[in-house]
Amino acid sequence: MSQKQQTMKTIIAEKPSVAKEIAHIVGADKREEGYMQGNGYYVTWVFGHLVQPAMPETYGMKGFHAENLPVIPDPFVLVPRQVKTENGYKPDAGVLAQIKIIGKLFDSSERIIVATDAGREGELIFRYLYTYLGCRKPFDRLWISSLTDTAIREGLQNLRDGKEYDNLYHAAKARSEADWLVGINGTQALTIAAGRGTYSVGRVQTPTLGMVCERYWEHKRFESKPFWQVHFGVVDADSGNILKFTSANRWTDKATATDIYNKVKETGSAIITKVATKRKVEKAPLLYDLTTLQKEANSQHGFTAEHTLSIAQKLYEAKFITYPRTSSRYISDDVFATLPKLFKNLENHSEYGEKVKLLPGSEDYSKNSVNAAKVTDHHALLITENAAIGLFKDEKIVYDMILCRMIEAFSADCIKDITSVSAQVDHEVEFGISGSIIRQTGWRALSLKEKNKRQDKDADATDNEVKEQVIPNWQEGQHITLSGCTITEGKTKPKPLHTESTLLAAMETAGKEIEDDTMRQAMKDSGIGTPATRAAIIETLLKREYMVRQQKKLVPTEKGLALHSVVKNMAIANVEMTGKWEAELAKIERGEASADGFTHSIEGYTREITAELLGCDRLFSHKDSGCQCPKCKQGTMQFFGKVVRCSNKECGMPVFKQVAGKLLTDSDITDLLTKGKTRTLNGFTSKQGKSFSAAIAFDENFNTKFVFAEHKTAEKRGNVKRYKK
């Protein structure tokens, strides 16, 4: 740091790659260890949270002991990021080195420019480090929504006083401490009550797991019932097409439906009883926020929420799109004013030019997504002026989604005329048909939703669209001649298992089913999690083996179902309460609520859930199997509901009784534990729904596997729960 004679400023970015871009703009072109310098600037970086709240060991509380709970630090101690070792948590050496470098840079600077991500978590990353270092230097905030050279230069020319973001910091700090209190105390309390294994719970993850489990049980317990409907056709005299009428009723008795069918067939005609035409205006869809992008990328392309976020982050850092972790689907008027130039730059593009030309003139752009009052920290997702080149397949898919949504969002409304016709047969049985005619295509000319509909339509997708067909100019009282009659059988269907798309939607509205985009936006402060954290919550539940992915579906494991069965009626699993906490954090961020009041409430909540969880040991009742653990040879295997587990806490090897849809008997488990293999058992069900027979055995790592009669073995992943060392 040889520039002591010159007045220096330190710019701190969230990643080395971002620091490199900023250093280029400010002329800090000399590379040093952990930073760059030049032209009066030091430009350094963090890599995630370098500083975090300390673990309970720091407060002298080692191990899991009921008498220590709840652990409520006052104040919270901040420590360098730690890694777990055999001897407990230790500071990360690389983190310590970078903290030391940053501390010296701060000391050598007159002022600090904060260039961490412009959001709640980015603010906390800097503030925790600033507090830990005991720094008192004044700081300004670089608050930008893209990393283009233009955006960085404009941001540096319009730095904001760091104190303007105190409320953002207070909200971030309150969220961090709340997650610590609930996660640490809840996990320790439930693990103590269980008496074996580790059961992780969290302020957001446990209610989220609850929504997955509740949907699973609702789906599994649903009793599908048959129903019958009658249909008849009528030939359109103008087109020659056969138009299909369907009975308004669904009959659960086949005999009744058959009688109706015979009557319709015998009568051969119907009378029009009602004709109604109404105009439907479908406004252009709102721009993407992160959650909506993740939902549609999952339903259309099968991308996980984490994968979509990762791609969006790469596109942002490559300067191709604006800040991805946004919760807003709107832009302000000043951003709206830049769009004509942005779209004009694409007119001659080989691929996007034709799409952009579908837009109306700029004076006729839809302003459905323009509302400055609904712009939060960042506006909705947009592409930047930089040409997106060199994209990999998945990156191009996400980029195209964002661009095409922009074109849709600023296109004209789609206008349809929808005609509904009712008819009666023998003045008794009601039938109906509907058809729509598009009068103005508008934004649907480029509707990805229309173009990407797959033949194997997702089970979680809904299609409320009225079929596009011309209805003849029938009049009430007119008699029509029938052309054929059919009877069809259908079955009632349960709500489908959650996909990441539907789970994200449920998290967004705290479990409330809301289809309207505008209403969903109004609910966003009361959802659980944030756009920036929801993907991580889903991945946490998968990593902790509370649920698994089966194709696109999210299916709870026996471990997840067992946890939910214990906590489902407790405060820790209350989705609505978690949504209220998120709404309170949003108020803190806006300066409408006190962080101290929130913290006081969370501490009371922590005491409540800790007492509840410690008191649920009776729900973990167990019995001894009388069998030695085949793995460690020290503990005994004990029955806990649908799980058999080693009593040795150092081992804890589990054997799940539910295997591929079949519940093993105690006798089967005893054979497996003592002989290493069961007899050949019937009644297993494959992922394809086919029944098969096999024995269950241990492999060399004491994972369970199938052994088939022909002595070939095959590991059925997703059906047999595997124990990981």
Regions found by a protein language model. Give the residues of each.
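Intrinsically disordered, low-complexity regulatory segments
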Residues: 2-176, 180, 186, 451-454, ...
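Amphipathic alpha-helical transducer elements in NTP-driven molecular machines
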Residues: 16-23, 40-43, 47, 66-69, ...
